[in-house]
């Protein structure tokens, strides 16, 4: 027997082991007809899943965000069924069909058919037919050999591969059936196909089986799904807006960065204008960190093999590292992280308790292997710069340090115009290193730091890394998307591996606390987010060109040059458009280049020593003296105002 506490009823029940949510709902005499699934001990289940353990059960309805997982998983199966009905069961071979943040996809092989976006409406119509038929969705289990035989008969080679390599011997093999369609799956799924909500298929792309280039290329069909048509419409409108804000297009149009296949995928080159943005961000970062007591360091891009063995990267992270280099009979690796170097800086001399806290900070370039299909502009790259820092401190300093770091992170992100955050606290997993007391101190300090900000936060219970708990901060952009930025992470692993210690007041050795933290996460990615958040119209202090001077005619060039020199003397980034073009075209081109200020100069301005100021987001122009304009723009730059 098992005991289940049903949160919706605030009551505990005793059931036979193996009972399903469907059975439980029947026992409640139809009181909860709108339930689409449940959450048992934090794990999403459907109405068909056998319950074999005691715990807390929460019913999931459409208004619960977690219920979308059930909807989207079911729609992946409905799409797979539609493909088989359109192109023939024997011609369609299914790979995997998981959910995504906003929908689902399925990887398939279709003999004799290469899908394009033009095929999607036909697939959608077939899916709607399946939904309308209201097939009951049923779960059943097969013994391992029977399951393999079943899929061999259907020529489902990828399902057989999953059974043989992903499902351990002795573990139940579950399948789901709707109509004549059967798929290997753990769930969760809806009670029937007619419970499905609003959806849209959005794209087709290639995807290697298991993500390996040596495996067959499958076709991946993406869809998005929500419970209501309004939610779907709002999301599709957001996607259209996101296309206009694509940082890859903005970067090309504004000549900010370059990713050249001759150099290598995922390796960004900063062009002069993009380099200005990056330098401004890095300079502000360094200034703020020095003000807060950090010590700036620089470390090499490569390290000896032994370093990565000691750190554990070669045991746990090697698949994300680039291959070993042989130099003078010794192995070297380009660094995927800066941490071991900072540890060695700490260990370069004996440390006393009086020195703490030690805060080491670096804008360190790291290299991590990403599959070519995962690369995406500046958002997913192979070489990037982390705004990395490691704080090494005593136990009595932990709480203050965490509070200070979180304060730094939030204030920094706010200074770039972000004011909506989602904060997550990830706690101790089942398997972990370090002692329980250190975990307790760390988790309490993280929790108190978040609560001191007044922000709501979500707890990912057991979601911490094996080496320490952490805080993650996500920012919401102008069109409502969330982006992972700041991480504050305890590490109980590296201090042990590298035998880090300090001499305490008792003249004995003690193990320090070590905190990893990054504010942006990646400079490249953060700039990509900024470009999309502002649609290229960056705050004036970040704009590569802050002012464009537009002379009305050639006779005004001499005065325009005088204005330019005055601005340059005041460290204002300015360009003079001396092309033989009409003024309206020059203005339009400056707008397309997202330049925040235009100064139009003609006879009147030359005679009076003024400029006609056209400011982004404002109608018409304002006449100011050169000094007045310089004073105005310098104040905007200094205060980091957003126009």
Swiss-Prot record:
It catalyses: tRNA(Thr) + L-threonine + ATP = L-threonyl-tRNA(Thr) + AMP + diphosphate + H(+). It is found in: Cytoplasm. PROSITE patterns: AA_TRNA_LIGASE_II, TGS. GO terms for cellular component: cytoplasm. Keywords: Aminoacyl-tRNA synthetase, ATP-binding, Cytoplasm, Ligase, Metal-binding, Nucleotide-binding, Protein biosynthesis, RNA-binding, tRNA-binding, Zinc. Pfam families: HGTP_anticodon (PF03129), tRNA-synt_2b (PF00587), tRNA_SAD (PF07973). GO terms for molecular function: ATP binding; metal ion binding; threonine-tRNA ligase activity; tRNA binding. Residues 246-539 are annotated as: Catalytic. It comes from the Bacteria. Homodimer. Catalyzes the attachment of threonine to tRNA(Thr) in a two-step reaction: L-threonine is first activated by ATP to form Thr-AMP and then transferred to the acceptor end of tRNA(Thr). Also edits incorrectly charged L-seryl-tRNA(Thr). NCBIfam families: thrS (TIGR00418). Belongs to the class-II aminoacyl-tRNA synthetase family. This is Threonine--tRNA ligase. It comes from Sulfurihydrogenibium sp. (strain YO3AOP1). The gene is thrS.
């Amino acid at each position: 027997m098992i005991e289940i506490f049903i949160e919706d009823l605030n009551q505990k029940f005793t059931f036979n082991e193996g009972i399903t949510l469907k059975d439980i709902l029947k026992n409640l005499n139809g009181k909860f007809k709108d339930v689409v699934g449940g959450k048992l001990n934090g794990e999403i289940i459907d109405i068909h899943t056998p319950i074999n353990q005691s715990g807390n059960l929460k019913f999931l309805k459409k208004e619960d965000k977690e219920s979308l997982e059930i909807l989207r998983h079911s729609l992946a199966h409905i799409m797979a069924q539609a493909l088989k009905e359109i192109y023939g069961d024997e011609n369609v071979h299914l790979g995997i069909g998981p959910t995504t943040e906003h929908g689902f996809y399925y990887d398939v092989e279709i003999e004799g058919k290469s899908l394009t976006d033009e095929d999607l409406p036909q697939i959608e119509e077939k899916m709607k037919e399946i939904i309308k038929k209201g097939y009951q969705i049923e779960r059943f289990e097969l013994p391992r050999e029977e399951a393999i035989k079943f899929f061999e008969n259907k020529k489902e080679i990828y399902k057989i591969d999953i059974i043989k390599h992903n499902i351990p011997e002795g573990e139940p093999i579950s399948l789901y059936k709707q109509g004549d369609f059967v798929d290997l799956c753990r769930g969760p799924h809806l009670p029937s196909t007619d419970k499905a909500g609003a959806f849209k298929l959005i794209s087709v792309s290639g995807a290697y089986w298991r993500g390996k280039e040596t495996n067959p290329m499958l076709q991946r069909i993406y869809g998005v799904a929500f419970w209501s048509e309004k939610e779907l419409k709002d999301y599709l409108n957001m996607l259209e807006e996101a296309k206009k804000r694509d940082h890859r297009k903005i970067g090309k149009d504004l000549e900010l960065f370059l990713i050249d296949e001759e150099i290598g995928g995922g390796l960004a080159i900063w062009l002069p204008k993009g380099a200005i943005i990056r330098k401004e961000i890095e300079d502000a970062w360094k200034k703020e960190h020095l003000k807060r007591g950090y010590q700036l360091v620089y470390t090499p891009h490569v390290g000896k093999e032994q370093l990565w063995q000691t750190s554990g990267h070669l045991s746990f992270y090697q698949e994300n590292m680039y291959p070993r280099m042989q130099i003078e009979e010794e192995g070297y690796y380009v660094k995927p992280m800066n941490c071991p170097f900072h540890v060695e800086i700490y260990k370069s001399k004996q440390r006393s308790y009086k020195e703490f806290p030690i805060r080491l900070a670096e804008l360190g370039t790291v290299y991590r292997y990403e599959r070519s299909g995962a690369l995406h502009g500046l958002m997913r790259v192979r070489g990037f710069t982390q705004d990395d820092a490691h704080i090494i401190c005593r136990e009595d300093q932990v709480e203050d340090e965490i509070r200070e770091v979180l304060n730094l992170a939030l204030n920094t992100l706010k200074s770039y115009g972000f004011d909506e955050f989602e904060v997550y606290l990830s706690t101790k997993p089942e398997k972990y290193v370090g002692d329980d007391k250190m975990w307790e101190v760390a988790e309490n300090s993280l929790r108190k730091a978040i609560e001191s900000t007044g922000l709501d936060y979500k707890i990912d219970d057991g979601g911490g890394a094996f080496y320490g708990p952490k805080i993650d901060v996500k920012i919401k952009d102008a069109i409502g998307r969330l982006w992972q930025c700041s991480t504050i992470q305890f590490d109980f692993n590296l201090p042990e591996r590298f035998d880090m210690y300090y001499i305490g007041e008792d003249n004995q050795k003690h193990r320090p606390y070590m905190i990893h933290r990054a504010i942006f996460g990646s400079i490249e990615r953060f700039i990509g987010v900024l470009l999309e958040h502002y649609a290229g119209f960056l705050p004036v202090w970040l704009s590569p060109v802050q002012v464009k001077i537009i002379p009305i005619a050639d006779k005004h060039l001499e005065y325009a040059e005088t204005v330019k020199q005055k601005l340059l003397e005041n460290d204002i980034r300015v360009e003079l458009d001396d092309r033989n073009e009409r003024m309206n075209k020059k203005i339009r081109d400056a707008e397309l280049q997202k330049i925040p200020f235009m100064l139009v100069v003609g006879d009147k301005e030359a005679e009076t020593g003024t400029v006609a100021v056209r400011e982004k987001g404002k109608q018409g122009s304002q006449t100011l003296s050169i000094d007045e304009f310089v004073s105005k723009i310098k104040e905007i730059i200094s205060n980091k105002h957003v126009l």
